[in-house]
From Swiss-Prot:
GO molecular function terms listed in the Swiss-Prot or TrEMBL record: copper ion binding; zinc ion binding
Membrane-spanning ranges: none
Coiled coil: none
Protein's job: Metallothioneins have a high content of cysteine residues that bind various heavy metals.
Keyword Cytoplasm: no
GO BP, sorted A to Z: cellular detoxification; intracellular copper ion homeostasis
Organism: Actinidia deliciosa
Keyword Metal-binding recorded: yes
InterPro entries on file: MT3
Entry keyword set: Metal-binding, Metal-thiolate cluster
Protein name from the UniProt record: Metallothionein-like protein type 3
Tree of life domain: Eukaryota
């Protein structure tokens, strides 16, 4: 399920922010900053995560 974020399909699996693994691929400095900011609340949600701006899903639960 590397291309899915819970029940949501992500077009780009690198946009899925998972607990303990907030960044898979860094394209630009701006992208890096956005991923880090999103990774903090996602990790605090106890395993719940959300996809990045490139993905339509926002409240996905990661396995």
């Amino acid at each position: 399920m590397s291309d899915k974020c819970g029940n949501c399909d992500c077009a780009d699996s690198s946009q899925c922010v998972k607990k303990g693994n907030s960044i898979d691929i860094v394209e630009t400095d701006k992208s890096y900053i956005e991923d880090v900011v999103m990774g903090v609340p996602a990790a605090e949600s106890g395993g719940k995560c959300k996809c990045g701006t490139s993905c339509p899903c926002v409240n996905c639960t990661c396995d």
